[in-house]
Amino acid sequence: MTVTGAYGVRLSGLPVDTWLGVSGAPHWPELSCEMDSRSDAPELALDMDTRKLRVRDDIAHSEFVHPLLGRVASQVALARGADAMHAGAVAGSAGAWAVIGPKGAGKSTLLASLNDIGVPIVTDDVLVFRDGAVMAGPRCIDLRPDAPRRGLGIAVRPSDPRSRIALPPIAAEHDLAGVIHLEWSSGETAMQPLDHRDAIRRLLILRSDKGYPRDPQALLDLATLPTLLLKRPRSLKQMDAAVAQVERLLCESGGRAAARR
């Protein structure tokens, strides 16, 4: 059954549920959303004791879904003993692969291109994880105006113009199989394994920049997973090669799309 939720929480009380649809999440805690009409209210106010989320009623649903919900999700994750990080993820039958890159690394553009060929996208921007499982994010990808892409999304977030691509509903949780780091290159597209030391170094840089993952042990656990570096030129013409590398990885690790059981 598909329910309204993302990032490890079910959401009730929202006037609309666009871009929020996952299956197999009855065990996720529920946040009760209430609209707040006060002009001086914060955009979002989370009370974990009562599991209530107050949303200022002039906040557009598109803004709530992204980026605001991701910020709340990180707080909820920590309160539940989970963790989070700035990353996307794609699904294969052997599990999900986290996709990590600094701002401007083309993460969302790559995920949108993978979605075009039917690769299931677990999340675009925030990855919540716990006990070896990752939680599905909102069912959309936001692309900046300067992002090279095929096809058109819909315009959202007037304060920060982007185009939004809708994603289909997906299973709520997936085993975490490995990590892909993104990097631009002046040469050919290539994917190479990273050793444990380099995996830790890159995760520490991410933590220093974004503040997550918070738990040092969670970071070390991530670094023990198979870790790869995908290097590719800043060219839409080379996107097919990058997509092919990720698709090959998913096939070699057992094919696409299976949920955690």
PLM feature spans:
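Glycine-rich, often acidic-flanked micro-motifs
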Residues: 3-8, 14-17, 88, 92-101, ...
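Short linear motifs at secondary-structure transitions and domain/linker junctions
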Residues: 19-33, 58-67, 73-75, 96-97, ...
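Post-Walker A alpha-helix
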Residues: 110-111
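Conserved lysine of the Walker
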Residues: 107
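Extreme N-terminal, non-catalytic leader segments
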Residues: 36-93
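Walker A (P-loop) phosphate-binding loop of P-loop NTPases
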Residues: 104
